[in-house]
């Protein structure tokens, strides 16, 4: 059985010391797990993510990453946890693609040919190797998002957190993000997807449902992605999930699986 790589215990978080954005949040993420954090806007998802790599420090409770207390050693934790933010403009700050993707590994001591290889291979993984000498400001939103992913992958973190990774992307962009996630899983990385869109979490091993700063439920997709629970917590119920529940079918493991199951049902019908 895989061991927890992230342990969150009784976490409380407040920006002003009075009003809590997170209240008594506790959960674990196992090594190599594809873990989803689901919640409506304002649930506290982004605040929780910032605690997981030490950008924010808990006033009450604690967060452990690979056994390291985030509050005591945030610098070490940031080497282990990479965050791809929802808006790449919040993450990218170097003039060129080459400089942006090379910045992290350079600061970790990678030099010369090794650095060139890391930059090229990270960009290749997101289909951006041909953009290596382009200026960041000349890129589209989707291209910037891919560079932001490459910049995190170049640092080879054990844990990669994607905050709303599918927002404002076309079908091709979403597929590319999924391909990256699948590659990371094959490499044994721990991947966390943070979103308000339930359909993107069908492939997760487990999902945490967060609302109003509190944990509502943690479990496998079939235990969390239940229409009445989603509605109760101000989340849209994807048509595909509603349909499977109405038909009395077990939730599919992916959107592709859902299409295959429904296609076979229609043929039988």
From Swiss-Prot:
It is a peripheral membrane protein. GO terms for cellular component: ATP-binding cassette (ABC) transporter complex. Residues 6-237 form the ABC transporter domain. It holds the Pfam family ABC_tran. It is found in: Cell membrane. Disulfide bonds: none annotated. Its main location: membrane. Gene3D superfamilies: P-loop containing nucleotide triphosphate hydrolases. The keyword Transmembrane helix does not apply. Its EC number is 7.-.-.-. InterPro entries: AAA+_ATPase (IPR003593), ABC_transporter-like_ATP-bd (IPR003439), ABC_transporter-like_CS (IPR017871), ABC_transpr_CbiO/EcfA_su (IPR015856), ECF_ABC_transporter_ATP-bd (IPR050095), P-loop_NTPase (IPR027417). The keyword Signal does not apply. GO terms for molecular function: ATP binding; ATP hydrolysis activity; ATPase-coupled transmembrane transporter activity. ATP binds at residues 39-46. Keywords: ATP-binding, Cell membrane, Membrane, Nucleotide-binding, Translocase, Transport. PANTHER family: ENERGY-COUPLING FACTOR TRANSPORTER ATP-BINDING PROTEIN ECFA1, HEAVY METAL TRANSPORTER. Belongs to the ABC transporter superfamily. Probably part of an ABC transporter complex. Responsible for energy coupling to the transport system. This is Putative ABC transporter ATP-binding protein PF0528.
